[in-house]
Amino acid sequence: MKKEAHIREWIRKLAVLRPEMGGFAVCPYASEASYTIIECLVGDIEPIKGFDVVIFVVERELTPEDVDEWVESLNEIYPEYVFLEDAADRASYIGEIQTNNGYYNIILMQNKEKLRKMREKLGNTPYYDHWSDEFLREILKDDYELIKR
């Protein structure tokens, strides 16, 4: 399966309503978010406006730790955005549901203010009840305190 097709299928799966998540999707806004998929070298990543999410597909040979370091750096350089990792060789789960794409190294970029509003809205629902506290802290970082547990 080609990269773009694989990623589009992953996004489709993230948008499926899951009974084991109380009827929520892994990513409740995935089905309505505008996005673009950009294949590039990790060092060439720069913000791209006009989309809810920019999905950067970066080098496969990067380790999860390499991807983490790049994400940390990008978050420092571009504080108005949130960059999140999806490392190919690091599976992530909410309960028993695998949330990562499982094949490509991806860095996702979203507008920080808009993402924070969505997280806050979800925090007023039982959505985050299905997340482990560790995963919640890892993903939400500074927004962790916004979420009412």
Give the location of each predicted region.
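Expand to "…catalyze enediolate/carbanion chemistry for C-C bond making/breaking, isomerization
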Residues: 1-149
